């Protein structure tokens, strides 16, 4: 008993020293979590020996001590991975590596530089929710560390890693609870993101690097301007038949630009539907995805889609274009979706081989 008391005193003194020093050195924070793990181990041993109090402190149950020890081990190992990377010399506060921040969405990641995103439901300023987004999210994978930026769009908070868009907060979840009309607007960085059927535009928003790269590879886009934080509007000039009157309908349709491989993240843009040469805002139009490539690969891929059946409405059999001008007879599989949001989720969650070309669009049914 006396030995346990002495060890606990030394351990807790060291923990208090870390609080007082307020260090910005990652090595000190690794040592802090090492002693937090040791404290849990001492409590666990004391409880095993039948002690319910030690040094006038209540000894937690075995389950509580074990759970906290596992969390301390996880954080210690995560920080050691970051320490062995190029980010070890950054300034790190004890708050940056706290358990509370670690468990905040996206969970299981070290994060820094948080800021508030406000979501207003049903246009009611009194019916709002606040979420935390992060400018630096550290994703640890085995011995490597990648830093990504938290981004925001109408659907939620997300980051893009290895070409995959991952949402760690989805606004529709709270809309189900607090919104009558299931409509909201997002306030972030001094900008407002409205429902995709009425996209707010501003020339003051800087577009992310990934969109600049995409537009550089797609010269067909003749005019660009910022739409909202993390997105950019691309308006392509489409010749309207002279006989068709201009109704002035402000309806917009959100559309995903074509991506050539899984490494290209889906990019949301907005096309003004007054250009009716291609897109119509009627109820018979459904979002689609064409997958083009080797027939056998597509057949295997279509079989794998069964476990993602909630992310699409229907999938076609393998088909080909025919005609004397068709030079490349690649196989095609087409998927349809109930909404563009469902299509976005499919493209962000389903792994598509790099040998398959992915293109998006709309089809009247």
From Swiss-Prot:
Misc: HPV16, in comparison to HPV types 6 and 11, is more often associated with malignant genital cancers in humans. Part of the antigens expressed and presented within HPV-positive head and neck tumors.
GO cellular component: host cell nucleus; host cytoskeleton
Protein's name according to its UniProt entry: Regulatory protein E2
Subcellular location: Host nucleus
Protein task: Plays a role in the initiation of viral DNA replication. A dimer of E2 interacts with a dimer of E1 in order to improve specificity of E1 DNA binding activity. Once the complex recognizes and binds DNA at specific sites, the E2 dimer is removed from DNA. E2 also regulates viral transcription through binding to the E2RE response element (5'-ACCNNNNNNGGT-3') present in multiple copies in the regulatory regions of the viral genome. Activates or represses transcription depending on E2RE's position with regards to proximal promoter elements including the TATA-box.
Main location: host cell
Cross-link Glycyl lysine isopeptide (Lys-Gly) (interchain with G-Cter in SUMO), where in sequence: 292
InterPro entries per UniProt: E2/EBNA1_C_sf (IPR035975), Nucleotide-bd_a/b_plait_sf (IPR012677), Papillomavirus_E2_C (IPR000427), PPV_E2_N (IPR001866), Reg_prot_E2 (IPR033668), Regulatory_protein_E2_N (IPR036050), Regulatory_protein_E2_N_1 (IPR042503), Regulatory_protein_E2_N_2 (IPR042504)
Annotated region (Transactivation domain), positions in chain: 1-200
Assembly: Binds DNA as homodimer. Interacts with protein E1; this interaction greatly increases E1 DNA-binding activity. Interacts with protein L1; this interaction enhances E2-dependent replication and transcription activation. Interacts with protein L2; this interaction inhibits E2 transcriptional activity but not DNA replication function E2. Interacts with protein E7; this interaction inhibits E7 oncogenic activity. Interacts with host TAF1; this interaction modulates E2-dependent transcriptional regulation. Interacts with host BRD4; this interaction mediates E2 transcriptional activation function.
Family: Belongs to the papillomaviridae E2 protein family.
């Amino acid at each position: 008993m006396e030995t346990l008391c002495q060890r606990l005193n030394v351990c807790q003194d060291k923990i208090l020293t870390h609080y007082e020093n307020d260090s910005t050195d990652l090595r000190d924070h690794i040592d802090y979590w090492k002693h937090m793990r040791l404290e849990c181990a001492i409590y666990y041993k004391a409880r095993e020996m039948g002690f319910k109090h030690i040094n006038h402190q209540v000894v937690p149950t075995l389950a509580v001590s074990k759970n906290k020890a596992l969390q301390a081990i996880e954080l210690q190992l995560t920080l050691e991975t970051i320490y062995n990377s190029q980010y070890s010399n950054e300034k790190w506060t004890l708050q940056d590596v706290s358990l509370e921040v670690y468990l905040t969405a996206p969970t299981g990641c070290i994060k820094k530089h948080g800021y508030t995103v406000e979501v207003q439901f049903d246009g009611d300023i009194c019916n709002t929710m606040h979420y935390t987004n992060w400018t630096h999210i550290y994703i640890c994978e085995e011995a490597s560390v990648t830093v990504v930026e938290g981004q925001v769009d109408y659907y939620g908070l997300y980051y893009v890693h290895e070409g995959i868009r991952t949402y760690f907060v989805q606004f529709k979840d709270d809309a189900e609870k607090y919104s009558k009309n299931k409509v909201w607007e997002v306030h972030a960085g001094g900008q407002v993101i409205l429902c995709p059927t009425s996209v707010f535009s501003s020339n003051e928003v800087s577009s992310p690097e990934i969109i600049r790269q995409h537009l550089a590879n797609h010269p067909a886009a003749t005019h660009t301007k910022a739409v909202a934080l993390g997105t950019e509007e691309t308006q392509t000039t489409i010749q309207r038949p002279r006989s068709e009157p201009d109704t002035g309908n402000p309806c917009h349709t959100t559309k995903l630009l074509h991506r050539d491989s899984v490494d290209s993240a889906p990019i949301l843009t907005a096309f003004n539907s007054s250009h009716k040469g291609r897109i119509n805002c009627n109820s018979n139009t459904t979002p689609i995805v064409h997958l083009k490539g080797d027939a056998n690969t597509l057949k295997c891929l279509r079989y794998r889609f069964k476990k993602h059946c909630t992310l699409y409405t229907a999938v076609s059999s393998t088909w080909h274009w025919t005609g004397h001008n068709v030079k490349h007879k690649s196989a095609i599989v087409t998927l349809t979706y109930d909404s563009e949001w469902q299509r976005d989720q499919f493209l962000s969650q389903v792994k598509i081989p790099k040998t398959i070309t992915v293109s998006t669009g709309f089809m009247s049914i």
